[in-house]
C-alpha cells in the first residue's frame, strides 16, 4: 500500500461484520486488507481470508459483501479472492465507496460486481520495500513482476479483457468511477437507487352553489322555510315571533 492509500486508510472507519437480511448473508468489509502486524492495530479491524471465512461460516445463503477498502497486502487479497471465488454461494460484491489495490482483487470474486453511486475502483502494480545489494533488488523486481502477472490473470479471468490492456491499467495506476468501471467491464452494474416517493396533490372541487341549495332545501323541509320568506323562516328556527 503506497502513502496515498495509507492516508485514505486512516479515513476509512474499520467495520467487519455480518448479518442476515431478507434471507441473505450481508457481510460488511470496511478497512484495510492484511494482518494486524502490518499496521500494529486490532485483528478484528482487518480484511483477510480467515476473517472472511469466520463471517461466512457454513452459510448456504446468497452472500452480499459491502466492500470499502483502500487495499493492503496483495497476498491476503488474492487468498480472500480465491476463498470467495470457490464458494458455492452466489456472491455479490457491492463497492460502497472504494475498492483499491488488493481490495479490487477481492471484488473480482463476485458473481456480480455492483458499483454504488459515487464509488471508485483502482488497480495498480504491486509495490514493496527492499534493501540489500543489487542481486537482492533484482530478486525483488522479479518477484514484483510475477505478482503483477498474477494480478493481471485475476482481472482477465473475471472480465475477459485483453491482458495487455489490463497491464497498461496497472502500470498507470488507473482509477475508475462507478460509471467507468461498468463501461470498461470490470463491474457489472450500477446499484439502483430507490425511486423517490411521488408527491400527489389531490384537488377537490367544491360546488358552492350546490351545497347552498342543499342547505336551503334541508331547512325548508324541516322547518317549512320558504326562500322568499327568510325572516319568517328564521323566526321558526330560533323561536321568534311570526
Describe each model-derived feature in a short phrase.
Residues 1-94, 98-102, 110-242:
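N-terminal organellar transit peptides
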Amino acid at each position: 500500500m503506497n502513502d496515498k492509500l495509507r492516508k485514505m486508510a486512516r479515513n476509512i472507519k474499520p467495520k467487519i461484520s455480518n448479518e442476515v437480511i431478507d434471507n441473505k448473508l450481508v457481510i460488511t468489509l470496511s478497512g484495510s486488507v492484511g494482518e494486524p502486524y502490518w499496521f500494529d492495530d486490532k485483528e478484528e479491524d482487518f480484511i483477510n481470508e480467515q476473517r472472511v471465512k469466520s463471517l461466512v461460516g457454513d452459510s448456504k445463503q446468497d452472500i452480499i459483501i459491502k466492500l470499502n477498502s483502500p487495499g493492503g497486502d496483495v497476498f491476503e487479497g488474492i487468498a480472500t479472492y480465491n476463498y470467495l471465488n470457490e464458494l458455492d454461494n452466489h456472491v455479490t460484491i457491492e463497492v460502497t465507496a472504494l475498492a483499491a489495490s488488493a481490495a479490487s482483487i477481492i471484488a473480482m470474486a463476485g458473481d456480480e460486481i455492483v458499483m454504488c453511486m459515487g464509488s471508485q475502483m483502482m488497480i495498480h502494480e504491486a509495490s514493496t520495500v527492499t534493501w540489500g545489494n543489487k542481486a537482492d533488488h533484482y530478486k525483488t523486481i522479479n518477484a514484483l513482476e510475477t505478482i503483477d502477472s498474477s494480478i493481471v490473470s485475476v482481472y482477465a479471468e473475471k472480465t475477459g479483457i485483453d491482458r495487455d490492456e489490463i497491464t497498461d491499467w496497472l502500470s498507470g495506476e488507473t482509477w475508475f468511477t462507478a460509471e467507468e468501471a461498468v463501461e470498461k467491464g470490470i463491474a457489472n452494474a450500477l446499484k439502483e437507487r430507490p425511486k423517490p416517493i411521488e408527491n400527489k396533490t389531490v384537488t377537490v372541487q367544491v360546488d358552492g352553489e350546490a351545497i347552498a341549495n342543499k342547505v336551503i332545501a334541508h331547512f325548508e323541509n324541516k322547518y317549512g322555510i320558504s326562500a322568499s320568506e327568510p325572516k319568517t323562516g328564521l323566526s321558526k328556527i330560533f323561536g321568534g315571533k311570526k
